[in-house]
Amino acid sequence: MKTYMINTNAHSAMIDITEKVRSEIKDQGIQNGFVIVQSLHTTAGITVNENADPDVVTDFLRRLDEVYPWHQESDLHMEGNTAAHLKTSTVGPSQTILINEGDLVLGTWQGIYFCEFDGPRRNRSFAVKGVEG
């Protein structure tokens, strides 16, 4: 398993980590199996989504903001980031991606994203673990 550090520069962002994951499975020598990619934070998640059109990311983040507005007077959490926790629970903390013949099994337009919902932050982290078999 390898842990990667990432800095985020926006309150909400989706950072394409596909090539980091692809490189890691090659380094681990996984030919056929799967890889688990997991965020190590309660306010940042991992998702697989389109990586060809940047408007998809913009729309994705905007729609999450519509569902989970940042300022909600009824929220009790003292840090004021309840929306970030809800977004992370919706997206999920991890993804499992198949590996075939040494490469990720992703569709033409798919990429793996680290989703920041409480940034900007320094030293965010995610773990990558490949499993042969």
Give residue spans per PLM region.
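Active-site histidine-anchored catalytic micro-motif
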Residues: M1-G133
